[in-house]
Each structure stands twice: as C-alpha cells, then as structure tokens.
Amino acid sequence: MILTALLAVGCGVLVGFTLGLIGGGGSILATPLLLYVVGMQNPHLAIGTGAVAVSANAFMNLSGHARAGNVRWPTAAIFTAAGVGGAYAGSTLGKAFDGQHLLILFALLMILFGVLMLRPRREGSHAPAVLTPRYVLRTAGTGLGVGMLSGFFGIGGGFLIVPGLIFATGMPMIYAIGTSLFAVGMFGLTTAANYAMSGLVDWIVAAEYIAGGVLGGLLGMRAAIYLSGRKQTLTRVFAGIIFIVAAYMLWRSLGHG
C-alpha cells in the first residue's frame, strides 16, 4: 500500500511537472503511468481515476492563468458547452469498448499528439474575439469533436484543445493554453463523473495523484520560467518520450510483456 501510494504521488508529480513546463500535453501520460507504474490492472479504472486527477489539476492551473488575463471566457464557454456533451457521449462509448483495444487506440492517439507537438505553431491575433455566427459555430463544432475524443480516451485533452482553439479562433498560443484549461477541467470532470457512476474510479489513488500534481505543477512552472529560451528543445524531448511510451503501450497491448 505504501509503495503504491508513493508511486501514485510520484507519477502525479511527473504529470503535474510536464503540465506546468510545456502546457496541456502532460495529461496524456496520466493513464499509461497508472497502468504501467502504479500497477492498475483495469484500463477503465485507470482512465476514470486519471480523469479525476487531470480535471482537478487543470482547475488549479486555471486560476493562475485567469489572474494573468490569459483566459478568453466567452470562447471558453462556447467551446466547453459543446464539448461537455461530446465528453459524456465519448466516455459512455469508451466504457463499453474493450479495454485492450482502447489502449491500442490511445497509443495511436499519443503518436498523433507527438507529431502535432513537433509542428510549428502560428501566432494568432491578440485582438478580442468577435462572436460572429461563423466564429460560434466553428468554435462549438471543434469543441464537440475534441470533447468526444477527450471523453472516449478519458483524458483532459489539452493537447487537442490548444491546437483546436487556435484552428477555430486564431487566438495566440498563450490565450489558447489559458482558455484550454477550463475545457480540460470540465471535460475531465464529465468523464470522471461518468466513470464514477460505474464504480470505475479509485478515489484514494486519485487523491494521491492530485497531491503529486500540485507539487509537480509548481515545480514545472518555475522550471518553465528558467528554461523559457529552450522551450522548443523541451517540447521535442517530451514528444520523444510520448513516442517511446506509445510504442511500449502498443507492445504490451498486442500481447507482449
């Protein structure tokens, strides 16, 4: 029990650290770490537990970005309102999906995420958003699609939400990161509630994960300040880690190890 608790806290620190250092992508490590380091045997239990931790850590990180003025609340509301319904539908489908097949798809999504991380990102407009019908429809449509993927895989989806917001609205990266945290928290909360209703959340491990995430997030944000000039290098290193973890998940899920 003590070893499991230490592993859960340690993994929470790692996820929180990567969230604080490079943004929303760190949440994608939550489920693999619960499965292969903490030692959870049930993929669905790992997804539900990870969703609780990701949601809590996202809301805690949101407060700092909100104080800095990095959250565009009207856009966050439109994106999240559409995405919550998608997250519920996606998580309902995910619970009914075979656990091992779900992990294979999860690993493939991780590879896609790694590729997206390596792509250069354009800087958007700093002007306040004008809520035209086209803007609202595009934002809501993107939110619905990202919410479904987030719920299906039990992840906060920050790595999908950030490029999704930039694609839909053209906002700068810093605003996309801040705005995404509200959606990450709400999508994760929706997924966690759906899994919890089926008894697929280990609340003790979730609490340990959250505690580690708080510490890791603080360390990650401090590291990001000191290493801001090397952020592209750090992103590439993290993408490499994602590829390695995805390859390991595929290897395990296909009957090896």
What is each residue range found by the language model?
Residues G50-V54, S180-V184, V205-I210:
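Short hydrophobic/aromatic, small-residue-rich stretches within specific transmembrane helices
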Residues G178-L189, F243:
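Hydrophobic alpha-helical transmembrane segments of multi-pass integral membrane proteins
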Residues I22-T31, G154-G164:
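Transmembrane helix boundary and interhelical junction motifs in multipass membrane proteins
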Residues T49-S63:
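Transmembrane alpha-helices of multi-pass small-molecule transport proteins
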Residues T191-A196:
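Membrane-helix boundary/interface segments in integral membrane proteins
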Residues P43-I47, I177, L181:
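Small-residue hotspots at the loop-to-helix junctions and early N-terminal turns
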Residues M1-T18, T31-P43, S63-L149, F167, ...:
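Juxtamembrane transmembrane-helix boundary motif
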Residues S55-A58, I111-G114, G185-G188, A246:
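Small-residue-rich packing faces within the transmembrane alpha-helices of Major Facilitator Superfamily
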